[in-house]
């Protein structure tokens, strides 16, 4: 028997075009594929990170998102990853529900932090940005 592991980020026949695009962005972010990220996102994406979450504020443009938000967030942790497990298609908005997996130190145990991401999609299929809400208490408790 063939043991094939299927990831929630793999495309399935029932996925809409917009869900496929959001899944492609999560895969590109995970592999740090800058060319693909720039192809998927609009030129000036907006990351609206919930107040109370580390570095929570609104980031506009690639340099603020990747040179500001992610750089500051990653300086606080040893590892960080977003693992969506459900996608909901709302037309020009795709909601992803999942968990961040965070370790704060080299020897620390991973902590799971629930999140909801609402991704805006423009008329050309490019992602405009994200509205993020997460369980900040879990992040700070770790």
Question: Where are each of the predicted segments found?
Answer:
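Hydrophobic alpha-helical elements and their junctions with loops/disorder across both membrane
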Residues: 29, 35, 52, 103-105
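A generic helix-loop boundary/linker signal
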Residues: 12-15, 27, 55, 59, ...
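A beta-strand edge to alpha-helix "cap/lid" segment located at domain peripheries
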Residues: 1-17, 67-142
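Short, low-complexity N-terminal intrinsically disordered segments enriched in polar/charged residues
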Residues: 1-43
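A solvent-exposed, acidic/Ser-Thr-rich amphipathic alpha-helical stretch
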Residues: 34-92
């Amino acid at each position: 028997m063939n043991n094939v592991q299927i990831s929630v980020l793999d495309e399935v026949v029932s996925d809409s075009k917009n869900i496929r695009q959001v899944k492609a962005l999560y895969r590109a972010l995970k592999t740090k594929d800058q060319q693909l990220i720039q192809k998927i996102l609009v030129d000036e994406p907006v990351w609206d990170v919930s107040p109370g979450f580390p570095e929570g504020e609104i980031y506009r443009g690639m340099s603020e998102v990747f040179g500001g938000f992610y750089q500051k967030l990653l300086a606080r942790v040893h590892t960080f990853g977003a693992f969506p497990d459900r996608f909901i298609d709302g037309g020009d908005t795709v909601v992803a529900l999942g968990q961040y997996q965070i370790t704060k130190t080299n020897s620390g145990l991973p902590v799971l932090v629930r999140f909801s991401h609402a991704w805006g999609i423009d008329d050309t299929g490019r992602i405009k940005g994200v509205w993020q809400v997460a369980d900040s208490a879990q992040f700070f408790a770790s």
